[in-house]
Amino acid sequence: MLDDKNFLKNIELNWDNEEKAKNFLYNLLKCRVLFDKYILKREFIKDCKENGKWSLQRLEAYQDEKNGKSLKPKYIGTFSGDDNNKKLRTLQACLRITYTSPKTMHWISLVLKNLIYDENNDLLKILEDYCVKKVKESNYEQASGFAFERIVFTYLDYILYRDGYSYKGKSIISK
């Protein structure tokens, strides 16, 4: 992965011959495509122009019948509207509001690292495992007051969304 502190060293290491340079550029472009396709972003359109809404979209080509059947780009949902897509969007939103600084968005590097080798990796499992690890590392058992890390609360929100919640036989949060 690229590290801004060592960017010039990385460039130097990856440009000392033509094959390395081509491979570096290919992987850089591949990471960009994977980022665009699998990482949640804010979309400012229609009714959401002011605050935006979370979206997970990929670029697809379509034939423009009007202009000589040339290919044109359009964005469509990365996944179908299934339950896993909603869970993945919700979990990524949890991580986006927990880790707001680029210096703390390590989960994005984790996703790209896993996808660059196999795009069929289970992103939901990868991110849920990451969150569980971060919650355990937060020392939440000993924390009180403002010492609780934000991930404890945002991941709990996600779990309640994912699994639902009932109290005394009454559904409070449904799946």
PLM regions: where:
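Flexible coil/loop and intrinsically disordered segments
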Residues: 1-175
